Amino acid sequence: MHQDQPSHFRAQEYGTKRKSDHGSVTETEIIEYVSGQPGVVTVTASKENSAPESAWGDTFFFYDPDRNRPENQRLPFATVVVHDYVGWDTESQLDRDGIFRVNIAVGRSGFEQLLGYPPAQHQAHHEEFDYAATDVLIPHPTYASQGWVSVLNPAERTSVQVRQLLDDAHALAVRRHERRLDARQT
């Protein structure tokens, strides 16, 4: 456990929760938690960092401990998305007040363990899920086939699981980074 975790995540680990919000976690708490992981670069899309306007407000987490990977070579291991991408990703109805989605790259094996089928078979299962439901682990509506899962507004049912999946995704990103370094050295 990280010493600088938001208090809510610490409380959830020990089986307690804030009474005022039934265990819900804010997007700020998630951003602070993931940003506190070693080697994480956090980018919140904005006009100032020349991100496309459609992404403004969305947060992307990359593992780049040396902070030297070119931006066009960074792949996030998790994101926090706060609005729909019209024409691309609208099934979660993120334009509702107070709704955000945590997206986590769990990999093929993790995806299959969580959902019971491999990511490559997601299209056959797509209609089984309510992508607008809150506090439920679901396949990512657009990137499930690449091993991504999502939770809208994690709360009592999913906040502990989301934290663990974020930790696992970070560890997976670390391993991928180390493999890239090893490949360059051989």
Per-range role (PLM):
Residues Y33, Q37, H125-H126, D168-A173:
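Conserved short hydrophobic interaction patches
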Residues H2-D4, F9-V86:
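Charge-rich, low-complexity N-terminal segments
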